Amino acid sequence: MADEGGLETGAHDELKGTEEQAVNFAPSPDFLWLCEQLFAKIDHVQFERANNLLTKPVTARYYEVISNFTTLWRTTVGNNIYPALRLILPYRDRRVFNIKDYTLIKAICAFLKLPKDSSTEKKLINWKQDAGRSVRLSKFCVEEIKKRRSEPQIDRNERITIDDLNGYLDQLAIERTEQGRSFKNLANSDIMNKCLTSMTFLEMQYFFDILLKNRPLGGHEHKLLNCWHPDAQDYLSVVSDLETVAKRLWDPSQRLGNQDLKINIGLAFAPQLATKLHVSYQKIGEKLGWDFFIEEKMDGERIQMHYTNFGSDIKFYSRRATDYTYLYGNNLKTGTLANFINLNKNVKDCVLDCEVVTFDSNNKIVLPFGMVKSSAKNMLSQDGIDTQGFHPLLMVFDVLYLNGATLVDLPYYKRREYLKQILTPTAHRIEIIKSIRANDEQMIKKSLEKALSVGSEGIILKRYDSRYVIASRSDDWIKIKPEYLEQFGENMDLVLMGRDPSKKDSLMLGLLDYEEVIQDSPIMVNSQSSEENSQRFRGFVSLCIIANGISNEEYKEIDRKTKGLWNDSEKIPPLEYMKFGSKVPRQWIDPKKSLILEIKARSLDNTRSSERKFAAGCTLFGGYCRQIREDKNWKTCYTLQEFERAKSGNNWRKRGSSKPQKVISKKRRYNIISSVNKALEDFAELEHRSDIFDGMYFYVLSDYFDGVKRKRIKKSEIQKVIVANGGQLVQNVITRNYNLNDLRIISSRNTVECNSLIVRGYDIISPKWVFDCLLSGKIMKLEPSHCFNFSKQLMDYAYKRIDQYGDPYERDINKYEWSSLTSEKICTTAKQQPDVQFDNSLMDVPHFLFHGRIVFLLSDNNNIQKESFMVDAYGGKVTNELSSANLVIVVGAVTQRRINDIRKQISSEVIKQDHPPRIPDMVSEGWLYDCIKQNTQVAEDNYRLP
């Protein structure tokens, strides 16, 4: 254990020295000055951008405004920017006002003395319906105030300064905590009235933003931090405290070292996170060196506890630096957790990494965190804590700082030893997460089986000798949890690309596509741009259409934020980076100016029609919108590469196909297409390989998606293959110096240009024909699989060349096709079945609500007739075999013992598989009723059982 205060004293002395120099030599500027010199100018740049008035690149203009402001502050005010930072970045400020839109609107209406339920009040409450995309609530409110009040005329010496406003806000935060959060208390606040009567309209606008914790700078926080000091952004991610950043980083010439970017006692930091890998247990074990700890994955909230001065000062911070100290206690005698902490008497300071879960003291079980979300809101007040039979339980798993010394560079096993030495658990209040040391695949399976049998989320594997890496997601920590049947993995943050307007708009969403760039220079560990530099933006590809799960309020919010940005489909979108399939929305929006929606799906739809409809090569089945992601933009949305990895890591089954099913083993399937991939590798270089395409001209319009391996072959790769085998490329079909009979137009996507050529009578060939020619070593006659869009006459000829199973009459099949045909199991009744694709739009019909659901109804009294009828009536199936179910619904009051028995049966499948399993979800009957009520399959998260 480190010496008490040894390292800490030096750190405080150093900080003290810097604090003495971070001072301002001039009086505090007016708040109006801050509004005019920074906020208003940033808004003006946004106005210039929206109206195409910029004479410089928009990023350069933003940096110009912000750099001028920071220079002006240094030269006219001083080196301490903390007073301004609290107002510029209010969402980073520690003060809590508890003011939401409705609270502020009602307080403003009271200030204006408007009658209750007046038209103006209703207009303000429903402001999103009338406000433009770039209009914030603050501006909307000020416009209404202007109509009823004249602007206050304030003498210069009576203006509110930045320091004055910070003082007022400090008092307001105390008032809102002690006197309550109602709008009446805010309306009656002397501070609120003082500000409203002493501010210009410009000041009011940004004052309202500060109260609402909005972003007056938009998304340009990093630009301000970089202009003030080159290390400010990195340092803020470590300490999460504006005051510390301002006091330490006042001189841009003084750079931080690696030691400075480590844990600071009392200041929140971004924790290390576990990675979820879609690989086998064998691969996971290899990554961890076959020496690791196995711990239960707790279903709670990540918390870091900062313990200082022998427990006289304790802080609790969430993963995102939210201060929950008022909730859990600030010393050993207060709160719902702090007063149960029992550390060694020699521990002066320490930082513990933990998870807070909810414990049911009546049934002695840990409750799923999703079940207590509503009660967690009540827990924000002291009266709501430790009631209704459950209370918070702190599960500790790591110690990162001890008596002045950081422990992050110590191996994990050593940190665990320290933790057990310094912390004495208190049953059901403060406990250490149990762990076992493991070194083989069987232990992973058994641990996961045991965790699932008691209703746990899963397990976490941690490398035995791993160090702790702040603000990272490391492969040294790997989480393993099952995927639920009828769900497609993790939630996805998708970008809005288009819509079909109607009574209930259908929104088209897509994925960000990029390609990896090989780095010539080494990547610095602390470089935030290293990941960005290794990826080159390619564009966006359409993935799905979503209409379920979006509330009327969210539709209004989407309309407001995208107002004026929609284009009708007659206007061609920027095809260089917007890729649609055959399904083109009636209106499209530039994804770079669009919104991000969080989507949950039941599974993938891999049918041939879906492959053509969407540029991603498939779509989502049962997609459901969870929320609008205000904290995300197009640069941080879900990528095509992440999507492909998620697909390859799971055996997602096809949906909606009524064609004869061809059952091909995974091994054979990869053998069949290996020669095509080999061809791509062999012809990747532009050296001459053959003369197969000699005398032929090719116009290539799109990439090609390999429907078997789920791999995309880029347009440029197809062109290289053609050139390497004697073909010539053309860039358009209008200007030509060749015979039209020698032209082959190649495409697998209904792009705008492709559709235009189809209308003009051109036949379009699939890229599959190119690769089949290479496999055969000669020009092949066209078969149906080669025809992307052909005239009826040519299609009739193509179908005459194959039998009912797709076997060609006029050419020899290669060994891969032979392997495919001999391994298929052909349905004998295939000829009588119509060749149709299931239309997923039918899922909107109530009778298909539970299509694909095979439900096991669990009840102690077998009184399940009503629920069984409801499942059947809405398109699902009820089964008595748990092994065939993809959903378990618990009906009525079922004993915990019976539920655990079912969980054990489900978890027993874990031991039989080499990958993390897919298991049926288990929900309460409330899920069934809410699905029918909302006419969509709602997310299961809030209905899971303890």
UniProtKB/Swiss-Prot annotation:
Enzyme class name: ligase
* Alphabetical UniProt keywords: ATP-binding, DNA damage, DNA recombination, DNA repair, Ligase, Magnesium, Metal-binding, Nucleotide-binding, Nucleus, Repeat
Q: Where does Mg(2+) 1 bind?
A: 355
Q: Where in the cell is it found?
A: Nucleus
What SMART domains would the database entry show?
A: BRCT
Q: Which residues form the BRCT domain?
A: 688-787, 845-945
Q: Which Pfam families match?
A: BRCT_2, DNA_ligase_A_M, DNA_ligase_A_N
One GO cellular component, as annotated: DNA ligase IV complex
Chief location category: nucleus
Q: Which GO terms describe its biological process?
A: DNA biosynthetic process; DNA recombination; double-strand break repair via classical nonhomologous end joining; maintenance of rDNA; nucleotide-excision repair, DNA gap filling
Q: What is its EC number?
A: 6.5.1.1
Q: Per its Swiss-Prot or TrEMBL entry, what cofactor is needed?
A: Mg(2+)
Stretches of the chain forming a coiled coil according to its record = none
Record: residues binding ATP: 295, 297, 302, 355, 397, 457, 462, 479, 481
Q: Which GO terms describe its molecular function?
A: ATP binding; DNA binding; DNA ligase (ATP) activity; metal ion binding
Family designation = Belongs to the ATP-dependent DNA ligase family.
What does the UniProt function comment say about this protein? DNA ligase involved in DNA non-homologous end joining (NHEJ); required for double-strand break (DSB) repair.
Protein name per the record = DNA ligase 4
